[in-house]
């Protein structure tokens, strides 16, 4: 039996309004629990369009057929008009998710975090995280115990900033296994549960065809030597590719693969490490990557 952490990122208004209810129904039918990370502030995701001038981002948008994958409402959100606030407008959906799944903060403003947080000072970062946590806690009526940085934009500054919130764990980086990042003080920080497997948009049209993706991914899962964690997006697997996701769950069950919330992957003893800036094939720009203590 292979146990895989299932992380669901919710980046946009439509992903919350349309994708999350569909995913909740699918997961219920398959008796699966997951960790769902919500963006709760303004939906300004369309402002990423300026990145089309970067060849790597343009190629990603073309090979993943982004207009069909996400829809023009997502691709243009927050460009010619202020982005709609996601959280309170979809409070009932978020509360329903929290009844059955582990719920955490993805971001207050996903676009702002992904585009600008790398240049924020620590206090600006703390204020932004606090705003998102406060909003999500108002919606679900209980403390939020986990978070996942938007776009995996995380480094030592993010690790230090999140210590102020005493969360149970964060999932801010890519890597191989859960670990505790070392703080500037030399003490171990809040546990990190890295994503180990590629997302749909990172590999489609580059490493694998859409129709072959599920078999390709299951092969990666079964060969994973660490602690496998897979991320889906409400805007993708909850919308245009929900049938592919259902097929993945069916095939996974046949292969003895089970999915669980990320918190079930934690153990009492974890290795030490760091979150450093790095690059992942298929994704434009830097992102947080696990580095085991003592390695280079």
From Swiss-Prot:
Boundaries of every NodB homology domain copy: 2-260
InterPro entries, alphabetized: ArnD (IPR023557), Glyco_hydro/deAcase_b/a-brl (IPR011330), NODB_dom (IPR002509), Polysacc_deacetylase_ArnD (IPR050248)
Induction or repression: Induced by BasR.
Entry's transmembrane regions: none
Keywords in alphabetical order: Antibiotic resistance, Hydrolase, Lipid A biosynthesis, Lipid biosynthesis, Lipid metabolism, Lipopolysaccharide biosynthesis
EC numbers for this chain: 3.5.1.n3
Reaction catalysis annotation: 4-deoxy-4-formamido-alpha-L-arabinopyranosyl di-trans,octa-cis-undecaprenyl phosphate + H2O = 4-amino-4-deoxy-alpha-L-arabinopyranosyl di-trans,octa-cis-undecaprenyl phosphate + formate
Family matches, as Pfam families: Polysacc_deac_1
One GO cellular component, as annotated: membrane
PROSITE patterns reported for this sequence: NODB
A single BP term in Gene Ontology: response to iron(III) ion
Annotated CDD domains: CE4_ArnD
Main enzyme class: hydrolase
Pathways per UniProt: Glycolipid biosynthesis; 4-amino-4-deoxy-alpha-L-arabinose undecaprenyl phosphate biosynthesis; 4-amino-4-deoxy-alpha-L-arabinose undecaprenyl phosphate from UDP-4-deoxy-4-formamido-beta-L-arabinose and undecaprenyl phosphate: step 2/2; Bacterial outer membrane biogenesis; lipopolysaccharide biosynthesis
GO molecular function, one term: hydrolase activity, acting on carbon-nitrogen (but not peptide) bonds, in linear amides
Top-level taxon of the source organism: Bacteria
HAMAP family per record: ArnD
Record-stated family: Belongs to the polysaccharide deacetylase family. ArnD deformylase subfamily.
Functional summary from the UniProt entry: Catalyzes the deformylation of 4-deoxy-4-formamido-L-arabinose-phosphoundecaprenol to 4-amino-4-deoxy-L-arabinose-phosphoundecaprenol. The modified arabinose is attached to lipid A and is required for resistance to polymyxin and cationic antimicrobial peptides.
This protein's name: Probable 4-deoxy-4-formamido-L-arabinose-phosphoundecaprenol deformylase ArnD
Species of provenance: Escherichia coli (strain K12)
Originating gene: arnD
């Amino acid at each position: 039996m292979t146990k895989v952490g299932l992380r669901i990122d919710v980046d946009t208004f439509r992903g919350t309004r349309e994708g999350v209810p569909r995913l909740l129904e699918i997961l219920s039918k398959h008796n699966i629990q997951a960790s769902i990370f919500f963006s709760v502030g303004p939906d300004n995701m369309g402002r990423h369009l300026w990145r089309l001038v970067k060849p790597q981002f343009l190629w990603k948008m073309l090979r993943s057929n982004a207009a069909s994958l996400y829809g023009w409402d997502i691709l243009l959100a927050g460009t010619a008009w202020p982005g709609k606030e996601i959280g309170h407008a979809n409070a009932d959906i978020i509360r329903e998710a929290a009844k059955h799944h582990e719920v955490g903060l993805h971001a207050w403003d996903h676009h702002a975090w992904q585009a600008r947080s790398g240049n924020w000072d620590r206090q600006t970062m703390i204020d932004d995280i606090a705003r998102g946590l406060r909003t999500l806690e108002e919606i679900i009526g209980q403390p939020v115990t986990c978070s996942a940085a938007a776009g995996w934009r995380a480094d030592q500054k993010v690790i230090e900033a999140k210590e102020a919130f005493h969360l149970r764990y964060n999932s801010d980086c890519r890597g191989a296994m859960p670990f505790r990042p070392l703080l500037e003080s030399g003490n171990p920080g809040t546990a990190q549960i890295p994503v180990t497997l590629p997302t749909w948009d990172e590999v489609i049209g580059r490493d694998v065809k859409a129709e072959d993706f599920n078999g390709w991914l299951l092969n990666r899962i079964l060969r994973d030597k660490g602690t496998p964690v897979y991320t889906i997006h409400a805007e993708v697997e909850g919308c245009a590719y929900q049938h592919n996701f259902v097929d993945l769950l069916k095939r996974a069950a046949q292969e003895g693969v089970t999915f669980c919330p990320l918190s079930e992957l934690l153990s009492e003893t974890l290795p030490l490490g760091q979150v450093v800036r790095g690059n992942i094939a298929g994704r434009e720009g830097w992102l947080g990557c696990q580095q085991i203590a003592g390695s280079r």
